[in-house]
Regions:
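Flexible linker/context regions in extracytoplasmic redox proteins
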Residues: 1-71, 80-170
């Protein structure tokens, strides 16, 4: 994807907001796998508000989109509403998938400061499961070099496979 890839954020628009720069605000990922899951989860996200800066009218040329009020028109547990059967399951290895860049704005300058990268599995899982406990669990199961151990419990055939956790819902 050209725009909504793991390396992109809303920094180009966010840094035009003096309040965001002054607060050294974390930038919002526009990585499709993260953004679309967060938007669909909307009002059910534990971390609120969910703000993404986007295009807006002159002279500011930015707009603030608050997706924290979005209500998905269905049961979020039914992954096959959007996903083809089986494509939402955790693969044993992430393969060539890129993790999502994490960054913030430098106070005063508005320059982008890259803090690191979340692994691809952690990125998508914590998009919906964004509470402190879930985020801590994902962090604990990620090695310092970024290797993710999620498949130990969550791949198919394991006790806590995604298909089991969503049993009867897909």
């Amino acid at each position: 994807m050209l725009c909504h890839n793991p390396n992109n954020s809303d920094v180009a628009r966010r840094k035009r907001d003096p309040a965001a720069v002054a607060a050294a605000a974390p930038v919002g990922s526009i990585d499709f796998k993260v953004m679309i899951h967060k938007i669909h989860r909307g009002e059910n996200l534990e971390q609120q508000p969910y703000l993404i800066y986007g295009f807006g009218p002159p002279p500011l040329n930015y707009g603030i989109n608050d997706f924290g009020e979005v209500r998905f028109p269905g049961d979020l547990r039914i992954c096959t509403t959007c996903h083809a059967p089986g494509t939402y399951l955790l693969p044993p290895f992430p393969g060539t998938a890129l993790g999502t860049q994490v960054a913030h704005l430098e106070p005063g300058t508005g320059n982008l400061v890259v803090d690191g990268r979340l692994g691809p599995i952690r990125s998508v899982c914590t998009s919906c499961h964004d509470g402190d406990d879930a985020v801590a669990h994902a962090e604990t199961m990620t090695a310092p070099d970024g290797a993710e151990a999620c498949a130990v419990c969550h791949e198919e055939g394991r006790d806590f496979a995604v298909s089991i956790l969503h049993a009867g819902r897909n």
